[in-house]
């Protein structure tokens, strides 16, 4: 029987509670559970990894061509996911690699779809979207507005990898969203 989960954190909790025998979980959330950090008050036991399915990318999306680096997000309105969500902590990790905190931006807390709508309507400057590329929220936005992905440079990627071993460096090919 197929069941719909409520996200990685809830899925881990259901495994531990015994209400699920098998569940999907993002690698960062699994690390939080194992280490008892961020989404988890203490170390979680009673789960293990079976397989990795696909890679999700931390995508920083904007319709403003002047925003080229994460540092350019300072003072800008940025959707960083729901408070306490995996996206939220990914955003905090990436901002931190650039010496920025949540206080350095004007944070909004929105879903992928709401973030794309807010970008389309000019209500926010950028959004963190964590999903496999391509993802519908970005694809749909790119069909209606000039859309840009903000890149991380190698110096700051190295800083991020030093503190968060659940990330890996990857490149999203230009043609994934923007054609040739």
Please give the residue ranges for each predicted region.
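Sec-exported extracytoplasmic/periplasmic mature domains
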Residues: 16-20, 35, 65, 96-100, ...
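Short secondary-structure transition/capping segments
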Residues: 20, 42-58, 97-100, 129-132, ...
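Bilobed "Venus flytrap"/periplasmic-binding protein-like clamshell domains
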Residues: 1-2, 55-121
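Short N-terminal helix-initiation segments at or just after the protein's N-terminus
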Residues: 2-5, 19-25, 89-94, 129-145
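Short, glycine-/small- and polar/acidic-enriched structural segments
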Residues: 1-74, 79-82
């Amino acid at each position: 029987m197929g069941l719909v989960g409520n996200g990685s954190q809830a899925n881990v909790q259901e495994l531990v509670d015994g209400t699920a025998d098998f569940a999907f979980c993002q690698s960062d959330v699994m690390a939080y559970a194992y280490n008892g950090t961020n989404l988890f008050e203490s170390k979680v036991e009673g789960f293990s990894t079976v397989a990795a399915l696909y890679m999700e990318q931390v995508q920083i999306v904007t319709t403003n061509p002047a925003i080229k680096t994460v540092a350019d997000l300072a003072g800008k309105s940025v959707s960083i996911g729901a408070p306490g969500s995996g996206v939220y902590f990914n955003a905090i990790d990436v901002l931190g690699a650039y010496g920025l905190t949540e206080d350095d931006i004007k944070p909004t807390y929105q879903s992928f779809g709401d973030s794309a709508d807010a970008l389309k309507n000019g209500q926010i400057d950028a959004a963190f979207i964590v999903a496999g590329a391509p993802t519908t929220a970005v694809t749909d936005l790119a069909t209606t507005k000039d859309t840009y992905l903000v890149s991380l440079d190698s110096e700051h990627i190295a800083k991020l990898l030093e503190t968060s071993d659940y990330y890996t460096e990857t490149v999203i090919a230009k043609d994934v969203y923007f054609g040739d």
